[in-house]
């Protein structure tokens, strides 16, 4: 990982898994120039769901969130790249799929607010990436590796410091 890279947590939710969209979503993230450093196909139990959505615990939709995220398998991932969190959020599109722009994951594949296919760490919450990554992955499950194409995707950011 370079000084300019960051890691971000991304999850294909049960609706995206059931609709067979894991490959399409991974392809979009890779095509953007991001690099997967961890991936796990798994089921989320209620305890993990409560931890993951703890900030929504007092909201009226909390029980529905927990019920949905535990309803089927998910594909949890960690991605790395320059400004990775912001890039993922842009690719995802608006939270409500009906408001998401065409060309975004939710705009192209999503149906509504409750079935919006994908979760990504909040770019406005500085601790969200580390917290979510640690919740779903042990350090030894993340792989440091160099992609030979990085020089073809990003200009040398060191020249701009």
UniProtKB/Swiss-Prot annotation:
Organism this protein belongs to: Halobacterium salinarum (strain ATCC 700922 / JCM 11081 / NRC-1)
GO molecular function: ATP binding; metal ion binding; nucleoside diphosphate kinase activity
UniProt keyword annotation of Phosphoprotein present: yes
Needed co-factor(s): Mg(2+)
List of catalytic residues: 119 (pros-phosphohistidine intermediate)
Entries under PANTHER family matching the protein: NUCLEOSIDE DIPHOSPHATE KINASE
Top-tier EC class: transferase
Keyword ATP-binding found: yes
Family of this protein: Belongs to the NDK family.
Enzyme Commission no: 2.7.4.6
Identification of the protein by name: Nucleoside diphosphate kinase
Predominant location category: cytoplasm
InterPro entries: NDK-like_dom, NDK-like_dom_sf, Nucleoside_diP_kinase
Lineage: Archaea, Methanobacteriati, Methanobacteriota, Stenosarchaea group, Halobacteria
Keyword annotations: ATP-binding, Cytoplasm, Kinase, Magnesium, Metal-binding, Nucleotide metabolism, Nucleotide-binding, Phosphoprotein, Transferase
Binding-site residues for ATP, renumbered to this chain: 13, 61, 89, 95, 106, 116
